[in-house]
Regions:
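Short, glycine/polar-rich helix-capping loops at beta-to-alpha or helix-loop-helix junctions
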Residues: 10-13, 44-47, 66-71
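Short coil/turn connectors at secondary-structure junctions
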Residues: 1, 31-32, 54-55, 77-78
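Adenosine-phosphate binding glycine-rich loop
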Residues: 55-160
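Glycine-rich phosphate/diphosphate-binding loop of Rossmann-like nucleotide-binding domains
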Residues: 1-34
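Fold-independent oxyanion-binding glycine-rich loops
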Residues: 6-8, 38-40, 61-62, 86
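A general structural motif
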Residues: 19, 36-43, 62-67
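Short amphipathic alpha-helical segments
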Residues: 17, 47-50, 70-72, 95
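Rossmann-fold NAD(P) dinucleotide-binding segment
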Residues: 24-31, 41-59
Length: 160
């Protein structure tokens, strides 16, 4: 797997194990299997989206990486898998919830155990999300369903 990095600050692209695209403003014209935008909101606009139609997946680590909902819907209709930012960025929220609602378990556990729990919870939600996408629901509909879903406080589910 090749991992490419681009940033307006070229020094930030010097990451071991990656291929730097430097500060290339036309980075999106390259062919990628997976894109993980970790930058400003609205990065993927209509102009950029047209170059991403061969991409297999976009994992949205940036908050609101698409310029508007129509862009993400067009990419979804082109069979590009999009994992939305609320799912991708859930780890910190889950860890905070453990610390708040299970403080005893939090204080006696090793970080690796928390990471494993977080990874498991995020993975479950991502698979549930992908299953609902395949059933024909839109990202917006799924996120509303997940938001309105009644469930236990996730931090209380962590048992060390």
């Amino acid at each position: 797997i090749k991992t490419f990095v681009v940033d307006i600050d070229i020094k930030k692209t010097d990451i071991s194990g990656t291929i730097s695209l430097g500060d290339n403003k036309n980075w999106y014209k390259n062919n990628f299997d997976v894109i993980l935008p970790c930058s400003i909101s609205g990065l993927i606009n209509t102009d950029i989206a047209q170059f991403l139609l061969k991409t297999k997946a976009i994992i949205s680590a940036a908050n609101a990486p698409f310029g508007n909902d129509l862009i993400s819907e067009k990419l979804l209709k082109s069979n590009i898998v999009i994992i939305p930012d609320p799912l991708v960025n859930a780890g910190a929220v889950i860890a905070d919830s453990i610390e708040k609602y299970s403080p005893d378990a939090w204080s006696r556990t090793k970080p690796a155990e928390v990471y494993k729990f977080v990874q498991c919870q995020v993975r479950k939600k991502c698979f549930a999300y992908l299953s609902l996408i395949q059933s024909g629901l839109s990202s917006k509909e799924i996120l509303e369903l997940m938001h309105n879903e009644k469930s236990d406080i996730i931090g209380k589910l962590f048992i060390n």
